[in-house]
Each structure stands twice: as structure tokens, then as C-alpha cells.
Amino acid sequence: MSKKLTFQEIILTLQQFWNDQGCMLMQAYDNEKGAGTMSPYTFLRAIGPEPWNAAYVEPSRRPADGRYGENPNRLYQHHQFQVVMKPSPSNIQELYLQSLELLGINPLEHDIRFVEDNWENPSTGSAGLGWEVWLDGMEITQFTYFQQVGGLPTQPVTAEVTYGLERLASYIQEVDSVYDIEWADGVKYGEIFTHPEYEHSKYSFEVSDQDLLLGNFERFEAEAKRCLDEHLVHPAYDYVLKCSHTFNLLDARGAVSVTERAGYIARIRNLARVVAKTFVAERKRLGYPLLDAETREKLLAEEGE
């Protein structure tokens, strides 16, 4: 019987595969976020006419999902392997199935289903056609063809593939609890993450200072607007991410009512939309540097008319 891949070997295998498909290997973005989609390597790069192919691991924090390290499948922080390709390759689903084969999952020997599940992220004004990928009855991946990001239509169409690494590793290693996953030879997932999960859960549900967080949200929102006034897209987006994480902490703590919740989401969405519009305008001002010369000249001429 062949040796099962460790968590980090799964990551290395996916990195090598998508590198071979022409993706740049980016690093995790250094701000808290609820999903890999919220990284600027996806959110910003999915809009505008320039091509973009990237793959990266993204630790994703969801305070309300924390379970003090006691639930085998619910986590404060999990890891996603994010692939984003623009324009979308026509064979991206076939490429995805090839990646599973490299992980030791033969599509001919397993029940692999693409279950329609259109995707929406209200806090960033983003949506797309999507499918959950189910492997023998367990969701392991989300496929999305973005239709809009930051309230802007995506042209060309961007494809996103988001692997849930903990679920994938649980399946490959045949364990019932994420804490039993072998991260590296001789080191279990739980030996690294159980106590941080407990501490972050305790903070999110019991200890966080609600007044501090409420004040932080206001300050982060104001700073994002100030950055946008100066056309500083990336600093502004950093503060949008901070607003989002602060809201998630408030939500986990039960500090916002249903009505207030909708208001906070709208405020984050409005900021994200301005960031998106400003980013596209800045890329145009720079002359769309990632486009080839012929396409760039043609597009700039058309937009200048």
C-alpha cells in the first residue's frame, strides 16, 4: 500500500501541478480574511482586462466557526488552496480532475460530482456561476466562474478553484478528525493547531472587547476612505479586509443585531466597490502592463475614443 500524502505534500503537489499549468505561485496575503477569494490576488486581479494566473495557500479565518478545538470538522481557521485563472481555460475542469489524480484520487474509481451551487459574497459585491465538487459524498472544492467582483462585471471571465485542504487531507489520509491529519512526517495537525483553535474561539466568543471592535470598525472604514481619496488602492483594500474581519468578530460575539448586520455588510460592500473601480482606473492609467503590446494598444485606443 502506497504511503498517504501528508498535508504539506498535498500542498507541494498542487503547487507543482498548477505551476506546470502556467500559474504564478503567490504567498498567503498577510491580512486576516474569511476566504482565499478576498485576497487581492483574486479580488483585485479578477477584474479588468489583464490576464492573471495564480495559485496560493490562504489561511482563512471565520470566527463564528470556532469550536474551541473540540469539533473534528469546524474550525476558526482553515486552509484553502486557491487557483485563479483569467481568462478561464476551456479545459479547467479536466485540469482539476488531473490534479486529483496526482493526489492519488482516480476519478474512475470514485464518485466525483459537480453540484450546482452559484456563489455570492455580499460583503464584496461579488457573484458567479459555481459548483461544489463532491468526492464520495463530501464537498472538497468550490468551482466558480466570476460574473462580477466588487460590483464590476468580469471580462474576460475568471475561473476560481478553491480546494478545502483540511477536507481533502482528511479524505486522502482516511481520518475522521482534522486534528488527526498528518501535517508532516510524525507531526499531527492537532499538535500544531488545537490550542490556537481553543484560544481564538475563547477570544471570539467570550473575551473580545466589543467597544474596542466597534471603534476599530469606524476607524478602519474612515482610513479606507481616506486612502481612496488619495487613489491608494492597496492600502485602502487592506483596511476593507480589516473592516471585514472586525465585523466577523463582532458577529461571532453577538454584538450586532440582524438590522445592524445588514448595515455593516453594506458598508463593507460599498468600500469594496470603490476599491474595485479605483483599481481598474489605476491599471488603465498605468497602461495595463500585463497585456501584450498589441492588445494593450488596441484596448487603450478603444477606451480613449
Curated annotation (Swiss-Prot):
Cellular compartments annotated: Cytoplasm
Main localization of the protein described in the UniProt heading: cytoplasm
InterPro entries attached to this UniProt entry: aa-tRNA-synth_II/BPL/LPL, Gly-tRNA-synth_heterodimer, Gly-tRNA_ligase_asu
Any Gene Ontology CC annotation: cytosol
Cystine bridges: none
Classification via Gene3D superfamilies: Bira Bifunctional Protein, Domain 2 (3.30.930.10), Class II aaRS and biotin synthetases, domain 2 (1.20.58.180)
UniProt keyword ATP-binding present: yes
Molecular-function GO term, any one: glycine-tRNA ligase activity
Subunit organization: Tetramer of two alpha and two beta subunits.
Protein source organism: Streptococcus gordonii (strain Challis / ATCC 35105 / BCRC 15272 / CH1 / DL1 / V288)
Similarity-based family: Belongs to the class-II aminoacyl-tRNA synthetase family.
EC main group: ligase
NCBIfam families membership: glyQ, PRK09348.1
Catalyzed reactions per annotation: tRNA(Gly) + glycine + ATP = glycyl-tRNA(Gly) + AMP + diphosphate
Protein's UniProt name: Glycine--tRNA ligase alpha subunit
Superkingdom of origin: Bacteria
EC number(s) given by UniProt: 6.1.1.14
Gene Ontology terms describing biological process: glycyl-tRNA aminoacylation
